Amino acid sequence: VSNKTNNLIIALEEKEILLKELNHRVKNNMQTIISLIRLQNDEINDSKINILLTTIQNRISAMSHLHELLYQKDTITFVDANEYFEKIISEIKQSFEHDIDVIYDINCNLSSESAIYCGLILNELLTNSFKHAFDENKSGIVNISFFGKNKEYKLVYSDNGKGYNPNIKKSSLGLTLIETLAKKQLKAEMNISTNEGVKVKLRWKE
């Protein structure tokens, strides 16, 4: 019995090491892709294409940050949502030259599986706010709250911008991604209101 227990412990430790190494390699591969996109972007003098490539770059970065955190931590099953979301917020703020304050209150851990979807959703919400919600040279505010208890989670995102144009909303890839990730991957209840700026509420269980 003692030998079997020791063998199981060794096997689990080896599995943990392999998974951490996998996260490290995935992160490095994503960083290479990001670098290639950035180099290509620097060679192009077209603002629309520049924004498109930056958006793609940030989507990959959102996934890369998660793999980086999973590699750094002792556990690979959960991630600190505050630490993860801070990285995404910082990335978006550096990518777009807008005077927008991002105020956030995030206090929970997330499973690594849910975290990848939440990170991508947050990335798209922030991208939409920074790109479309505010007129050029006008300041704005984004509020994010995210809490979890007993495997029940609530994400509330809002900005005080112009709101969504219904026609743009239907054709927006970013909004389509948000709805697909929220409803099909997280199995979340989703509510979007656009009366004064934009407010998005997500609720789901794990």
Question: What are the language-model segments listed below?
Answer:
Residues I141, G163, N195-K201:
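Glycine-rich nucleotide-binding loop
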Residues L53-S61, H65, T77-Q94:
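Short beta-to-alpha transition helix within the HATPase_c
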Residues V1-T5, I9-L12, E16-L19, N23, ...:
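Amphipathic, heptad-repeat alpha-helical coiled-coil "signal-transmission/dimerization" linkers
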Residues I10-L19, N23, N45, F96-L126, ...:
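Conserved short strand/loop->alpha-helix "switch" segment adjacent to the catalytic nucleotide/phosphoryl-transfer site
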Residues P166-S193:
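ATP phosphate-binding glycine-rich loop and adjacent ATP-lid/helix-beta elements
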Residues S139-K151:
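Short beta-strand/loop element within the Bergerat-fold HATPase_c
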Residues L12-E13, I37-I49, D74-T75:
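Short acidic helix/loop segment immediately C-terminal to the autophosphorylated histidine
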Residues D159:
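Acidic ATP/Mg2+-coordinating residue in the GHKL
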